Amino acid sequence: MRLLTTVAALRCYLNKRRWESQLTASEEQILDSMTSWYQTAIGLVPTMGSLHQGHLSLIERARHENSTVIVSIFINPLQFGPNEDYGRYPRTLEQDRQLCEQAGVDAIFAPSPEELGIPQKNIQESQVTQVIPPSVMISGLCGHSRLGHFQGVATIVTKLLNLVQPDRAYFGQKDGQQLAVIKRLVADLNLPVEIVACPTVREASGLACSSRNQYLTAPEKQQAAVLYRGLLQAEAAFKAGVRYSSRLREVVRQELAKVSSVLVEYIELVEPTTLMPLDKIQEEGMLAIAARLGSTRLIDNTILRDRQPIIAIDGPAGAGKSTVARQVATKLGLVYLDTGAMYRAVTWLVLQQGIAIDDDCAIAELANNCKIELTPSQDLQSPVRVWINDTDVTQDIRTIEVTSQVSAIAAQAAVREALVKQQQRWGKRGGLVAEGRDIGTHVFPDAEVKIFLTASVGERARRRQQDFQKQGQPEVSLEQLEKDIAERDWKDSTRKVSPLQKAADAVELQTDGLSISDVASQIVDYYQQRLSQW
C-alpha cells in the first residue's frame, strides 16, 4: 500500500495503475480470446481520517467492487465554522494507515491543505474557488447552524473527484444531507462517477459510528444512543400507519426527552433526494436528527418508505432467475420486472440496425432514445412480452445471436445507466420482483429481500439446452453451452460497470437438483419470514 501526500504523486500512481491494467489486458487478450473484459475500476473512499467501523464498511464495499481502492484522508478546513472543532478533530494517520493496509486499500491520499491550494480558513474567509450547491439543499437541517459547511464539503469533494477520477465514490447514509448534496453535485456537473450510498454502521448501543464519538465518555455514549431509539420509535409508528411529519417528529421528541443531557437542535422530515420539507410521506421521507451532548454534536437519520417490498434476485446466466422470479411474483401477487429482457431488447436493436458491438457512442444514443415496454404474460410457460420502439421482440431477443452479444451490450456504461434509471422509476412504489446480475447491489440496493441464485456450469448448460429445444432453436451441444456459460460468467463478473456480484446481505441458493417450484417456494417462505419481522 502506498501513502501519497502530493497531487503529483497521486497522478503518477494512478497513471501507473491504469497503464498496468492496460498492459495486463493486452497480455491476457493474446493468451485467451475470451478475455476482452477487464475490471479496471477505481473506487474512492473520501474521509477525514480517524477511521472507524463505518469507514471500514465503505472500504470493504469498495474493495469488493473495484480493482483499485483509494482512501483520501483530509481534514477539510473549508467545512468547519469559526467556532467548530477543526483544531481538535482527531488526527490518527499512523493508526489509519494500519487499518487501511489491513483492509486491502491500494493507496492513501493524505495531502495538506496547502497541497490542495486551500488556506486553513473557513469557507467564508477563504478566497479559493467554491462549489455552491442549491441553496434549498443547504439552508435547512445542518445547514441552518453550520453556515458554509456544505459549500466546503462540495468544494473538496469536487476536487477529490477531479484528482482521482474514480469510477465509484463511497459515502455513508448517516450523513444524509451530505449524501444528497453530493449526488446532486455529481448530477448537475455531469461528473462521470457513481456515488454509492452505504448503510449506517452502529455501535452495539445503536449509536451511529462517528469519529466525533471519541469526544464522548462511556456514560455519554449510552446517553447518545437515545437518538437511535427515537428513530426506532418513529419507524414503529410509521409501520403502524403514521404518515404525518408532525406526529413522527413528536414521537422522536418524546423519546429524546427521556435523556435530559441531550439538547435537540432539530428533528425534521424531508424528501431524501431534494431535502425539501415534507408534511406527509407519500412515497419516502428522511427523518433526521441533530442534537448536542455536552460539546459534541450528533446526527442520525432513517429512511421511511411507503411502498411494498422489492425482491431482488441476482445470479449468473442460466441459474433460472427469470422463471423463478416470475413464479415468485405470481405467488405473492407482485409485479415481475424482467430486466434481462430489457438488455436483450437493446441488443436486438443494435444488431437490427447493423451497429458494431464496440461502437459505444452509437449504442449510447440508441439506448437513451429507445422506448421499452414490458407486459406480463398470464401463462407462466410463456415469457414476458417485450416491445422496443413499438416492435414486439419477445421471441427475437431469445435467439442465440442476441444471447451471445447481450453481455457486451449490458456492460456498456451508457446502456446500463439508461436502463437502470427506467428500472428505478418502475420500482419507486415497490411491489415487484426483479432479476438480473446487479439488482441487489446496484439497481435496488435497498431491496427488502435479496436472493443470489446459482448452479453449477453443467446444470446451467443443461437447462439452457432445454430452453433452446422448447423455443425451437437450433441444436447446440452441452460442451459448447458449458464453454459459452463459463465465458459469460467471466465477462459478467469482471466487467468494469456493475459486475455480477452477490450483495453482502443476500441469501445464496444453490439450485442444482432443485425444481423451479422448489426454489420459488424457498424464496416465498423467506419473504414471508422477513415480512413478519418488518
UniProtKB/Swiss-Prot annotation:
| Active-site residues annotated for this sequence | H55
Keywords assigned by UniProt, alphabetized: ATP-binding, Cytoplasm, Kinase, Ligase, Multifunctional enzyme, Nucleotide-binding, Pantothenate biosynthesis, Transferase
Per the record, its GO cellular-component terms are: cytosol
- Sites where the protein binds ATP: 48-55, 172-175, 201, 209-212
Region described as Cytidylate kinase: 303-534
Q: Where in the cell is it found?
A: Cytoplasm
Positions that bind (R)-pantoate: Q79, Q178
Question: Does Metal-binding appear among the keywords?
Answer: no
Instruction: Give the E.C. number(s).
Output: 6.3.2.1, 2.7.4.25
| Biochemical pathway | Cofactor biosynthesis; (R)-pantothenate biosynthesis; (R)-pantothenate from (R)-pantoate and beta-alanine: step 1/1
Q: What is the catalytic activity of this protein?
A: (R)-pantoate + beta-alanine + ATP = (R)-pantothenate + AMP + diphosphate + H(+); CMP + ATP = CDP + ADP; dCMP + ATP = dCDP + ADP
Residues engaged in binding beta-alanine: Q79
Q: Where is this region: Pantoate--beta-alanine ligase?
A: 1-302
Q: What is its main location?
A: cytoplasm
A Pfam family (short name) is Pantoate_ligase
An example GO biological process term is: pantothenate biosynthetic process
Any one Gene Ontology MF annotation carried by this entry is: ATP binding
- Classification via InterPro entries: Cyt_trans-like, Cytidylate_kin, Cytidylate_kinase_dom, P-loop_NTPase, Pantoate_ligase, Pantoate_ligase/cytidylate_kin, Pantoate_ligase_C, Rossmann-like_a/b/a_fold
Q: According to its UniProt record, which protein family does this protein belong to? A: In the N-terminal section; belongs to the pantothenate synthetase family.
What function does the entry list?
Answer: Catalyzes the condensation of pantoate with beta-alanine in an ATP-dependent reaction via a pantoyl-adenylate intermediate.
For this entry, the protein name equals Bifunctional pantoate ligase/cytidylate kinase
Query: Which organism is this protein's natural source?
Result: Trichormus variabilis (strain ATCC 29413 / PCC 7937)
